[in-house]
C-alpha cells in the first residue's frame, strides 16, 4: 500500500506571502525518498497487497500487455489462489465490496484492523458502535478550561496522504473583529519530532498568540489527530493508549468552549487536565461546525458526534427532564474507588454490581428507581428497556418474526423459539442432581429446586429450635459457556443445592421484607455472558411454603399470582383461548395448544424406543413406563405399584372405603366411575324389559360402556369406512383391524394370530393350569371370566340372544349364528343387518 511518491511542500498560506511569513506558518516539508524502510519496519500485509492491486495505474507499465500481466500478479498476491479455496476467494471479494460500501468514517478504522473475513469486519464495526455509544455518554463539558498542550508526545508522524493539511488562517489585513479572534485564539498544537531514516525529521513551526496567525476552534480536533492509517500502525500499544487519552482531552476541550447537545443537556464532570494556567472564555454569539475529513480515521467517530453539537448562546444551566438528570447523576457520581483492579466502569451504589459501559449501567439503575420511560402507544403499558417495548408491540401488530423450520410455528420472541426447539428434539438439558429429574426449561428447574429447598429447610427447622439461625451451604458445579450451544443441543447440567447439613447457619436474618437471592440457591456460573445474577429475588415464601395469593371463592392458596388467575377461571367459567378451527374454548393456553394438535395432526413427542408419537408430553412419560416396567406411584398401605397417578387414586379409595360415584336410580355407591357406568347399563336393560324387549345382552356390553365414557370427551378420530368416531387414535387403529382382518399379535404357544394384545393375554390363559374363575353351582373352573358367564347360563336357563325373524332365543351367540343361516336364503340382507347389530 505504501508506494514511492513525490511529496509536495504543504503550505498553509498563499504563495505570495510565503517568503515573508515563514516564521509564522505551520510548514511540513518532506523530500522525495524511497519508502522501502517502512516496508522493512512494517512487512506487507493482506491490506497492502489489496491496495497495490486497487491503486495500480496504467501509466506505471510500458504497455497494455505488461499492465495486464502486472495486474494478474498483483491479484494473485492479493487473493493467493494457491492457498485459498474458491469459497475463501469469494469471501475476500465480498469483504472488499463490504469495505467499499461502508461509511467513510468507518472505512479507515476497519481497514486498520485488517479483517480477513466479513464476520471480523462486522465485529470491528460493532465494537466501534459500542465505543461510540459509551463515549457519547461520557463526553462532558469541562467549564472554561482548555489545556495548553493538546497533542500526544511522540505520536505525530509523517503523513503519506496526498491531500494537504489545511488550516484556515485570518489575514492580518482583515479588520473584522480582531478582538474576537484573540478571544477565540488557541495555542497551536505542538508536533514533536519522530526520528526518520537518514536522520530526517518532521519539523513544525508553532504560531504565537500575539501577532501570528490564529487557528480556528473547530480545527483543533483536525490538527490534533492528523494521523494517517499507515502511521497509526507504527505506534506501539502505549503510544496508542496515550494518543486515545489525549484525543479525549482535545474533544473535551472543544466541548468546553460552549458546545452542547441538541437537547441542551448540560454535562458536568471533573477537569481532564491539571494544566489550568490558560483559560479561554466561550464566545457569546458564535455558531460553528466542525468540518469533516475522511483522512482522520482514528477520530472519525468523535468528529461525527462533534458535528451534531451546536454552540449554546447562553452558557449556563440547561433544562433537563428528571430521567436525564437521574441518568447523568448516576454516571457522574462515580469515584475511582468504585472501580475494580483499576478498570474504568460504573458500580451501582444499591446492589454493588459493576458495569463497564455506561448504557448498561443506566438500564440497570432503572431497576432500582422503577423508572419505565418506554411506553406503548396502544395500551399505555410501560417498560424500562426499549427491547421489551418492541417485543410487547408485536402483541398488537401480530408480528411473529421467529419461525420454526420444522413445524412452521412462529413466535414473537427468539427465546420462545429456542424453547420450542426442545419439543422436537425431546431434549431436557436441565437436570436435577438431587432426584435425577430433567427439565426442558431453566425456569422449570428453578421451580423444582425450590421444592427441594423448602423440604430441606423445613426438615432443618424441625430439628433446630426457633432461635437457631437458618442457613444454606451452597455448592454448585461450574459449567462452561461452551456447554450452552443451542444449535448443538444444549448440554447444561445445573448442579443442585447440596449438603444442607444437620446444623444450619444463615448469613443474614430473614425478615418479611428480605428475600433469598437466587445465587444463594444456584450459585454463580463461570461464564460472564451467562449471568444469572440478575434473576429476581425469591421471596421468603420459597422456604416457608407461604402461599400469599388466595382465592376468594374457595379459599385455595397459590404461590404465584399467575396460578391464581388461572384458577379463578374455573369459578368464572371464562375461556379466553378459542380454537379457530372448531370454535372450542379453553381456560388455559396450554390446553388450546394441545387441542390444536388434534386438527394439525402434530405429535411432537416421540418415543425413542418404539417410535410412537404423542401430542402431550405426559402421555409420552406414561408410555415410557411400558418399556421400563416402572411403576413409580406406589400405595403406602399395601405397597402395590401403578404406572399412572389416576390408577393409584382409584386404588386408595379401596383402603379408605371412599365411594364417590353414586347411582341416581338406586342410590348405590361405587369406587370407580367405570363401575358406575357398568351398573347403569343394568338399569337400561330393566327398562327395556318392561317394554317387552329383551335387552339382557346390554348387561355386559362394553360398547355401550365406552360410548358412555366418551360422551364427555372429544372424538376427533373418525373411521373413513363406517364413519365411527373415537376419542383416541389407538382405538381407531384397533377398529381398522375389523375392516382389514389384520391380526398382528401372535400366541407364543400355538402361534395363533389375534387382533388385539389384550386378546393374546386372554388366549394364553387357556394353556395355563390355573383356573381362577370357579362356578358356585357345580364347582367347575374356567380360565376366562367370559367362559364362566357362558357356563352359568346353563344353570340359570338364561338365553340372551334372540332372533328377530322368528323370536327364538339362544344361550350362546354361536348358536344364534347357526340359526340365522337358515334365514339366509329367504332374506339375506336382513340376516346381515342382524349379524352387524350383534357384532
Swiss-Prot record:
Compartment(s) where it occurs, according to its Swiss-Prot or TrEMBL record: Nucleus
KRAB domain segment(s): 218-291
Residues annotated as domain SCAN box: 51-132
Start-end of C2H2-type zinc fingers: 346-368, 374-396, 402-424, 430-452, 549-571, 577-599, 605-627, 633-655, 661-683, 717-739, 745-763, 773-795, 801-823
Superkingdom of origin: Eukaryota
Coiled coil (UniProt feature): none
Keywords assigned: DNA-binding, Isopeptide bond, Metal-binding, Nucleus, Phosphoprotein, Repeat, Transcription, Transcription regulation, Ubl conjugation, Zinc, Zinc-finger
Region (Disordered) location: 151-175
Modified positions (Phosphoserine) in chain numbering: 335
A Pfam family that the UniProt record links to this protein: zf-C2H2
Covalent link (Glycyl lysine isopeptide (Lys-Gly) (interchain with G-Cter in SUMO2)) residue numbers: 216, 248, 270, 303, 317, 509, 513, 709, 785
GO BP annotations listed: regulation of transcription by RNA polymerase II
Cellular component terms per the entry's GO annotation: nucleus
GO molecular function: DNA-binding transcription factor activity, RNA polymerase II-specific; RNA polymerase II cis-regulatory region sequence-specific DNA binding; zinc ion binding
InterPro entries to which the protein is assigned, alphabetical: KRAB, KRAB_dom_sf, SCAN_dom, SCAN_sf, Znf_C2H2_sf, Znf_C2H2_type
Polar residues compositional bias, start-end: 158-173
Membership in a protein family: Belongs to the krueppel C2H2-type zinc-finger protein family.
Stated role: May be involved in transcriptional regulation.
Name assigned to this protein: Zinc finger protein with KRAB and SCAN domains 5
Organism, scientific name: Pan troglodytes (Chimpanzee)
Name of the coding gene: ZKSCAN5
Amino acid at each position: 500500500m505504501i508506494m514511492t511518491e513525490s511529496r509536495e511542500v504543504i503550505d498553509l498560506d498563499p504563495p505570495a506571502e510565503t517568503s515573508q511569513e515563514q516564521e509564522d506558518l505551520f510548514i511540513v516539508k518532506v523530500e522525495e525518498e524511497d519508502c522501502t524502510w517502512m516496508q522493512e519496519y512494517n512487512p506487507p500485509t493482506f491490506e497492502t497487497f489489496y491496495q497495490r492491486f486497487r491503486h495500480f495505474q496504467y501509466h506505471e507499465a510500458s504497455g497494455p500487455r505488461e499492465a495486464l500481466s502486472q495486474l494478474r500478479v498483483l491479484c494473485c498476491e492479493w487473493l493467493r489462489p494457491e492457498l485459498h479455496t474458491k469459497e475463501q476467494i469469494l469471501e475476500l471479494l465480498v469483504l472488499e465490496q463490504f469495505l467499499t460500501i461502508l461509511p467513510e468514517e468507518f472505512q479507515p478504522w476497519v481497514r486498520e484492523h485488517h479483517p480477513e473475513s466479513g464476520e471480523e469486519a462486522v465485529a470491528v464495526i460493532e465494537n466501534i458502535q459500542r465505543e461510540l455509544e459509551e463515549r457519547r455518554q461520557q463526553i462532558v463539558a469541562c467549564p472554561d478550561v482548555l489545556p495548553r498542550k493538546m497533542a500526544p508526545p511522540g505520536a505525530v508522524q509523517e503523513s503519506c496522504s496526498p491531500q494537504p493539511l489545511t488550516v484556515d488562517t485570518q489575514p492580518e489585513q482583515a479588520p473584522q473583529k480582531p478582538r474576537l479572534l484573540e478571544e477565540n485564539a488557541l495555542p497551536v498544537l505542538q508536533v514533536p519530532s519522530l526520528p526518520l531514516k537518514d536522520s530526517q525529521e518532521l519539523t513544525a513551526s508553532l504560531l504565537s498568540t500575539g501577532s501570528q496567525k490564529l487557528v480556528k476552534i473547530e480545527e483543533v480536533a483536525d490538527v490534533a489527530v492528523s494521523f494517517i492509517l499507515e502511521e497509526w500502525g507504527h505506534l506501539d500499544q502505549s503510544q496508542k493508549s496515550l494518543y486515545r487519552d489525549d484525543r479525549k482531552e482535545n474533544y473535551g476541550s472543544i466541548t468546553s468552549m460552549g458546545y452542547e447537545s441538541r437537547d441542551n443537556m448540560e454535562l458536568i464532570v471533573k477537569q481532564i487536565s491539571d494544566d489550568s494556567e490558560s483559560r479561554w472564555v466561550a464566545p457569546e454569539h458564535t455558531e460553528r461546525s466542525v468540518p469533516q475529513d475522511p483522512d482522520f480515521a482514528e477520530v472519525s467517530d468523535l468528529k461525527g458526534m462533534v458535528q451534531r453539537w451546536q454552540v449554546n448562546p447562553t452558557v449556563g444551566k440547561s433544562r433537563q427532564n428528571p430521567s436525564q438528570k437521574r441518568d447523568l447523576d448516576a454516571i457522574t457520581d462515580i469515584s475511582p474507588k468504585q472501580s475494580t483492579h483499576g478498570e474504568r466502569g460504573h458500580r451501582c451504589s444499591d446492589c454493588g454490581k459493576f458495569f463497564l459501559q455506561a448504557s448498561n449501567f443506566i438500564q440497570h439503575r432503572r431497576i432500582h428507581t422503577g423508572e419505565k420511560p418506554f411506553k406503548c402507544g396502544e395500551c399505555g403499558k410501560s417498560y424500562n428497556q426499549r427491547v421489551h417495548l418492541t417485543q410487547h408491540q408485536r402483541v398488537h401488530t401480530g408480528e411473529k418474526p421467529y419461525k420454526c423450520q420444522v413445524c412452521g410455528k412462529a413466535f414473537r420472541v427468539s427465546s420462545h423459539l429456542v424453547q420450542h426447539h426442545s419439543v422436537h428434539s425431546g431434549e431436557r438439558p436441565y437436570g436435577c442432581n438431587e432426584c435425577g429429574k430433567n427439565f426442558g426449561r431453566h425456569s422449570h428447574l428453578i421451580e423444582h429446586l425450590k421444592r427441594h429447598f423448602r423440604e430441606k429447610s423445613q426438615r432443618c427447622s424441625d430439628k433446630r429450635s426457633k432461635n437457631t439461625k437458618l442457613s444454606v451451604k451452597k455448592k454448585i458445579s461450574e459449567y462452561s459457556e461452551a456447554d450452552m450451544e443451542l444449535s448443538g443441543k444444549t448440554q447444561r447440567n445445573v448442579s443442585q443445592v447440596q449438603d444442607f447439613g444437620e446444623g444450619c447457619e444463615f448469613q443474614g436474618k430473614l425478615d418479611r421484607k428480605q428475600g433469598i437471592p437466587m445465587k444463594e440457591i444456584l450459585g454463580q456460573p463461570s461464564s460472564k455472558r451467562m449471568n444469572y445474577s440478575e434473576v429476581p429475588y425469591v421471596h421468603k415464601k420459597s422456604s416457608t411454603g407461604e402461599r400469599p395469593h388466595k382465592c376468594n371463592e374457595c379459599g385455595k392458596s397459590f404461590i404465584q399470582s399467575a396460578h391464581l388467575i388461572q384458577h379463578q377461571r374455573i369459578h368464572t367459567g371464562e375461556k379466553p383461548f378459542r380454537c379457530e378451527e372448531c370454535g372450542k374454548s379453553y381456560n388455559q393456553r396450554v390446553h388450546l395448544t394441545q387441542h390444536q394438535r388434534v386438527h394439525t395432526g402434530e405429535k411432537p413427542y416421540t418415543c425413542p424406543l418404539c417410535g410412537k408419537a404423542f401430542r402431550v408430553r405426559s402421555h409420552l412419560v406414561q408410555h415410557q413406563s411400558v418399556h421400563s416396567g416402572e411403576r413409580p406411584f406406589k400405595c403406602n398401605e399395601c405397597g402395590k405399584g401403578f404406572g399412572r397417578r389416576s390408577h393409584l387414586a382409584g386404588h386408595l379409595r379401596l383402603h379408605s372405603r371412599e365411594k364417590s360415584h353414586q347411582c341416581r336410580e338406586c342410590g348405590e355407591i361405587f369406587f370407580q366411575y367405570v363401575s358406575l357406568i357398568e351398573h347403569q347399563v343394568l338399569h337400561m336393560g330393566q327398562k327395556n324389559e318392561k317394554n317387552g324387549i329383551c335387552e339382557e345382552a346390554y348387561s355386559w356390553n362394553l360398547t355401550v360402556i365406552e360410548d358412555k365414557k366418551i360422551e364427555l370427551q372429544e372424538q376427533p378420530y373418525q373411521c373413513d369406512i363406517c364413519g365411527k368416531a373415537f376419542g383416541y387414535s389407538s382405538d381407531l387403529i384397533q377398529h381398522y383391524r375389523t375392516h382389514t382382518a389384520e391380526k398382528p399379535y401372535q400366541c407364543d404357544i400355538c402361534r395363533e394370530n389375534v387382533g388385539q394384545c389384550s386378546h393374546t393375554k386372554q388366549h394364553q390363559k387357556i394353556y395355563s393350569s390355573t383356573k381362577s374363575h370357579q362356578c358356585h353351582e357345580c364347582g367347575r373352573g374356567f380360565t376366562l371370566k367370559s367362559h364362566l358367564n357362558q357356563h352359568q347360563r346353563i344353570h340359570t336357563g338364561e338365553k340372551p340372544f334372540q332372533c328377530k325373524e322368528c323370536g327364538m332365543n339362544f344361550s350362546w351367540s354361536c348358536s344364534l349364528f347357526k340359526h340365522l343361516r337358515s334365514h339366509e336364503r329367504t332374506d339375506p340382507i336382513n340376516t346381515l343387518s342382524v349379524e352387524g347389530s350383534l357384532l
